[in-house]
Design a protein with these regions (language model features):
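Metal-dependent nuclease catalytic regions and adjoining charged, substrate-binding loops involved
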Residues: 2, 130, 161-236
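Non-catalytic protein-protein interaction segments used by genome-maintenance enzymes to assemble
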Residues: 104-160, 197
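Short acidic (Asp/Glu) and glycine-rich catalytic loops that position anionic groups and cofactors
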Residues: 17-22, 41-42, 64, 136-140, ...
Length: 236
């Protein structure tokens, strides 16, 4: 089967939620946070690919790639749009001061893992002045992760493994660029855990194929389906 980071993460959080989304075809409706985040990602990709590094070009990209769905009304959409303009204006100033060179933007990868295929999409890989590579993931939440949270997060390690196995790029640094918070958190990448991560990705894919979808109620309080799931463990 084909497994992405999203499928892997959701299955490891709660196999029953995985079943809801990827077997039963349930959908999570867009909301203002998800629409804002995707709009900012799309604008950054368009701008970085354009070759025009001006602020006007970045704001033009935001207008062109803005997603209008998910907002309760036009007033709310206008507030979120103004926030996106502020966020990207600040990002532009920070980006212009960096000396790194992007070598990959929204780069898709696939690589074989036994009988499975691992697929993913990397926001950005930069080559730094010393020749090393930095893998960057954009986040649009209000708070940047702490260094400890970054160390515990499997997403960037999943992407770093994909960069090496599929693209032949061995990254030295993992970075979360919290665009909304205006902060970057980085750590050196240690590839020593790649074998264990690959084994767990493969094990998750095996379990999915075998139809093992038992619920894990630890994540119920923040689940999108907590109000209509028979297994939800939510205090009244």
């Amino acid at each position: 089967m084909e497994i992405s980071y999203t499928r892997y993460r959701i299955y490891r959080e709660c196999p029953w939620k995985y079943k809801f989304l990827f077997v039963d075809g349930r959908r999570i409706p867009p909301n203002e946070k998800s629409s804002f985040g995707l709009s900012v990602h799309r604008a950054l990709e368009t701008w970085l690919r354009s070759g025009d590094d001006s602020l006007d070009a970045l704001l033009d990209a935001l207008r062109a790639r803005w997603l209008a769905g998910g907002y309760p009304d036009e007033s709310a959409e206008s507030r979120w749009y103004a926030k996106a303009e502020r966020v990207l204006t600040r990002f532009h100033g920070e980006e212009m001061s960096r000396r790194a060179r992007p070598i990959a933007l929204e780069k898709e990868f696939t690589w074989p893992l036994g009988r499975h295929t691992v697929r993913g999409m990397i926001d950005r890989i930069d080559q730094l002045p010393d020749g090393s590579y930095e893998l960057i993931d954009y986040k649009t939440g209000p708070v940047a992760p702490t260094p400890d949270q970054l160390k515990a997060d499997l997403q960037l390690r999943f992407y770093a493994l994909g960069a090496f196995r599929a693209l032949g790029v061995r990254v030295a640094t993992l970075t979360v660029d919290s665009v909304t918070a205006g902060a970057r958190v980085s750590m050196p990448y240690d590839p020593s855990g790649e074998e264990a991560l690959g084994a767990d990705i493969s094990a998750a894919a095996d379990e999915i194929e075998s139809g093992r979808f038992g619920p894990d109620t630890r994540y119920c309080p923040r689940c999108d389906f907590k109000n209509d799931c028979v297994h939800a463990m939510i205090a009244p």
